[in-house]
Amino acid sequence: MSQRHSEPVRGSQSVPRSPLFEGRFGRLFRSLPEAKFGKTEKENIDNLTTLATKMSSQFDPPTDGKDPEESGIPALYTYLGQFIDHDITFDPASSLQKQDDPDALTDFRTPALDLDNIYGRGPDDQPYMYNDDGKTFLLGSKLTGGDPKATDLPRSSAHRALIGDPRNDENTIVSQLQGLFHRFHNRTVADNPTLPFHDIQKLVRFHYQYMLLNDFLVRLINADILEDLKEKGVYEKKKLKFFHWKNDPFMPVEFSVAAYRLGHSMVRPGYRLNDDDSTLLPIFLTDEAKKNKPPFDDDLQGFRAVGGNRGIDWGRFIDVDTRVYDGSKAENKRRLQFAYRIDTSVVFALSQLPAAVASDPSALPLRNLLRGWRLGLPSGQHVAHAMGVKPLTDKDILIGKGVDKQDPSDPPVISIDKVASVFKDNCPLWTYILAEAMHHKEKVHIPVKEKVTITTPQLGPVGGRIAAEVFLGLLFGDNNSLLNLQPEWTPDVTPYTLKDFVNYALGK
């Protein structure tokens, strides 16, 4: 969705904390005070910088084999989360340099789980994304190393992906996940040749929304929270306590700037794409990665043609088959990689973002903290009180890796009040939600040949409730969603999870 050139960003002249409800962005807890972390702008920035530094891990190269920071969630869910984020939010107007009013921001994506990041404006308006039949997506050049039918995304002469949302080419993994959605759509067309394009779209969206409700949320959010939003086993709109809208759902900043930034803690230092040793790559090529022994000379950055040998072997990202968890060196190269645990640590590379990705600041944890402060988010403790939840004590808000056994070489885990006195009973909402997850752990049986369980933190009563209510609200507020059109609908295969979606796209 593009902004008309003659119009400024909606509400850009509004005073902070506007009472309007109908912007694309807004607040869940409008009466709560903004959290401050200093008396001056410099003090706020300095204190948040200190916290961001404590949340940033030391350099750790991507390797094969099991990893103590892994959760029981296969790695592809991290990038499904990124894909979903691109489906519902795009805010090019908010700033890290000045205070922002959420009511003044425009979401340039529809705040709905409608796959507009896949379909764009449709074949009539964006025919260059589709084949001549006007129903199926164009696919790109062939990739090797993984799935034999793998292709890159279609690209312009400048190697830019011709897709519904260019952000889905940000890295090699989300780029190839976008390609799977294209192939899922194309196979749905082939299996239903008489259905018109609109009905094909609906069928694909239903599978996507069903997977989100019955798989994605279940893995990330504590089960008791999800059950509390149901009546007789079915999600009910009347169960939403905190997310309310007048005409159309908006995008709450407590979700987009805090709760749904959980995925940043799930990112690994790098990933292996397939058997080729050149495809064990860091997410970003930092100076430390270049100096590693052996050194890395490339990374998983996107916005370029995917190398021909970089087709993803999807069994390394999702359990489309069953592999050995921890075996010989050769077996470890083929193992299923798992997302890192939801905790208050972020891998080193995300604190050293390349200039092409972000700058001023280049550290993702600091960018998140500054954005929350600039948008006037309340503290985690204030939000907990407003939700009727007993807040975590400062001693419970731990900063560092949420592993079972600390590595002596890692910085010690410390409580938030030891970072700076300004954070006593005043934790930034994003950090609070991550810390809360460290107290809501499940032992997850992972889909491998051995019998293995892994400690897996999940979003708790503050972060999980915000995330669940917003996802459900976006679906209840969309007249064309699964929950409104056919809430009893189920896929042909049940239970239906991300691996089933991937297998269908792969032609299995």
Ranges and model annotations:
Residues 182-191:
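Active-site nucleophile-adjacent alpha helix/oxyanion-hole segment immediately C-terminal to the catalytic cysteine
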